[in-house]
């Protein structure tokens, strides 16, 4: 249950069952019945509220504009990570269409931090910010701090995280440095065995695979590599 975490501690199975049961009491009376993701989103909101969390990081399920998580009317900051071709059946067949869905999380008069994007994607984000009078910050460099994660793209991700943290009250530069050097990201270029050396990565779209390829070439370029790929058909 790693999708529900408070201070790096996963929600227990008992707590998960408790909150889903509470949500089900309401959901079972609704037509149409909420999807499992919508129910889990509602359970997460209730869980974080009752645990009195100071700051909550909510990750969109898919897209953004029509996602269940986007029910939040106002946020400290809306974060847009690199946009590439993904979930085309639901989000659109062009980068512009997908960017339109992703930029739907931008709030009126809000703050937006975006990673480096293709020009056509950035244009969509800028237009959305203009329409909603939102302030846009472009984290289009790489972090200068030491990070724990391998891969040059992780330095780009870290730059986004830095900008976000700088706009949250109570987070110092020292906190940011410590956070980056102690970050753990399971399933993203993660070594799970040394003999033989075994790396797992959850890349599931073109951009993710390209980034994985770059990391493999950088760290294992001169070695024989065996690939095992799983695809959900």
Spans of features found by a protein language model:
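Alpha-helical scaffold segments in soluble metabolic enzymes
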Residues: 18, 22, 43, 47, ...
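ATP-dependent carboxylate-amine ligase catalytic core
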Residues: 1-73, 91
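Acidic-glycine-rich active-site phosphate/pyrophosphate-binding loop
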Residues: 15-16, 134-144
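Conserved catalytic-core segment of NTP-binding enzymes
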Residues: 64-66, 72-133, 233
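Short catalytic-loop micro-motif centered on adjacent basic/acidic residues
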Residues: 32-35, 112-114, 199-200, 226-228
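Nucleotide phosphate-binding/pyrophosphate-handling subdomain across enzymes
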Residues: 55-58, 66-79, 83-84, 97, ...
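Conserved beta-strand termini and adjacent loop/short-helix elements that scaffold enzyme active sites
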Residues: 115, 139-141, 192
């Amino acid at each position: 249950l790693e999708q529900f975490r408070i201070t790096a501690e996963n929600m227990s199975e008992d707590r998960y069952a408790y909150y889903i049961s509470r949500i089900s009491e309401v959901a079972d009376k609704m037509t149409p019945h909420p999807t499992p993701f919508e129910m889990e989103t509602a359970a997460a909101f209730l869980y974080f509220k009752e645990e009195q969390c100071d700051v909550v990081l909510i990750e969109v399920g898919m897209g953004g504009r029509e996602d269940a998580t986007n029910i939040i009317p106002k946020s400290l900051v809306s974060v847009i990570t690199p946009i590439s071709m993904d979930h085309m059946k639901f989000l659109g067949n062009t980068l512009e269409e997908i960017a339109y869905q992703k930029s739907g999380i931008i709030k009126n008069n809000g703050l937006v931090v975006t990673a480096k994007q293709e020009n056509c994607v950035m244009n969509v984000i800028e237009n959305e910010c203009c329409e909603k009078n939102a302030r846009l910050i472009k984290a289009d460099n790489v972090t200068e701090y030491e990070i724990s994660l391998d891969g040059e793209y992780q330095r780009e991700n870290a730059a986004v995280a830095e900008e976000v943290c700088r706009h949250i009250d109570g987070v110092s530069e020292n906190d940011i440095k410590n956070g980056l050097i102690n970050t753990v990201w399971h399933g993203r270029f993660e070594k799970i065995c040394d003999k033989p050396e075994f790396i797992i990565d959850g890349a599931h779209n073109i951009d993710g695979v390209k980034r994985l390829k770059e990391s493999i070439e950088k760290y294992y370029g001169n070695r024989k590599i065996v690939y095992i790929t799983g695809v959900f058909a």
